[in-house]
Amino acid sequence: MSDPLADYTNLSHDEIDPSSANAAESEQAEPEQQVSEHYEPQPEELTYENDENVLNSIKVQKITDAEAIGEVVRKKVIRDSRPQGYQQDDFNDNSNVTLGSRPGHQQTDEIDISSMDPQQRKRFELEERMSAAIKPSNKRRRKADEDDLERMQDDKIDYLKDQMIKAANSDVEKNSQGQIATEKLKLLKEVSDILARADLAIPILDNNLLEAVRLWLEPLPDASMPAYQIQKELIHALETLPIKTDHLVASGIGKVLVFYQRSKRTEPSLKKIVDRLIGDWTRPILNKSDSYKDRTVQFHEYNRNKFTNKLSRGVKKREAKTLYEENAERRKRAAIPSTRTTAYKIAPQVDKSLLMRQQSRHASNDERFKRINSKLTSMSVKRKAAKKGGPSIEGRDLAM
């Protein structure tokens, strides 16, 4: 006979007490829930199976991981863990809302992704990669060593300025002692190379290298001018620099160029450049326009008696000779005359009535000349025809 209690003795503890089984299940569920709340998937666990399809659908190119790390500016992300005092219900209201899905929602620089589940985080990473691929890359990035490069340029200009000042002072001392001043000529090539560089134009002006240029262009203690090569290189270099009024005040180079403009020993070709530079520098100071439409021309009456008296006296102003002409005169050789352009500053006044009378007189003379010319032309044609043909056999055109 079978035991009636055998079926009950073989039951497990859960089957005997269902309430205890439910309690045990709840105890096991709570740590699993805590683990899921604090669980953060690692980057290698995220799979992007549909990335290629999504990127191909919007016709963009997928960037590489190196480009995403090195060149793409990513948003600052806070990955702080959620405080334990919060409950899961506090995050359920916005758990299903993705970034940018609500109307009027604006993305901020700081985004907390700790409240996102793995699916939302995966979507967020994909949106960032897509926005980085679509974003135009024509924005100029500041170089990491740009500040160091500017500092190096400033140090280079300061060092050259000190060398130029020392060379100028040394030449002044040698000239006062009656020696040959050659320190500036030794340093001229280096100075010309620096002044010719367009990328150093702003550092040259900011570090006031024009002050050293002024010292090089100043006359020596014995009233002699600097070497012609120094004048030529430095004055030509001043044309390429964007010199403003502040730079002129700080360096004082304008006074030296005014001396070169008024001096008779300045080479004519250099004097033209100096005149143009002084005109360009003084125009904004005097509030004058560089347009020829706004240019004012001085007019003066022509004095015939004054001109005839000057011719009768035979006084002719001697023009400044060039270095080539001076060398030829010193060697007692002939020099090829050079062409020179004359610039007039005063325009003569014109009498319109006198011009009209002259035009009418010329018109009457032209009519008389045309009539005489046509008559002479017809006579010459007849003479040529008579000489060529002669009298005919029948006696036509025969003078009796």
UniProtKB/Swiss-Prot annotation:
GO terms for cellular component: nucleus. GO terms for biological process: poly(A)+ mRNA export from nucleus. Residues 84-99 have a biased composition (Polar residues). The lineage of its organism: Eukaryota, Fungi, Dikarya, Ascomycota, Saccharomycotina. Residues 1-50, 77-149, 375-400 are annotated as: Disordered. It holds the Pfam family Med26. Keywords: Nucleus, Transcription, Transcription regulation. Belongs to the IWS1 family. This is Transcription factor IWS1. It is found in: Nucleus. It comes from the Eukaryota. Residues 119-130 have a biased composition (Basic and acidic residues). Residues 19-34 have a biased composition (Low complexity). Its main location: nucleus. Residues 211-288 form the TFIIS N-terminal domain. PANTHER family: PROTEIN IWS1 HOMOLOG (PTHR46010:SF1). Transcription factor involved in RNA polymerase II transcription regulation. May function in both SPT15/TBP post-recruitment and recruitment steps of transcription.
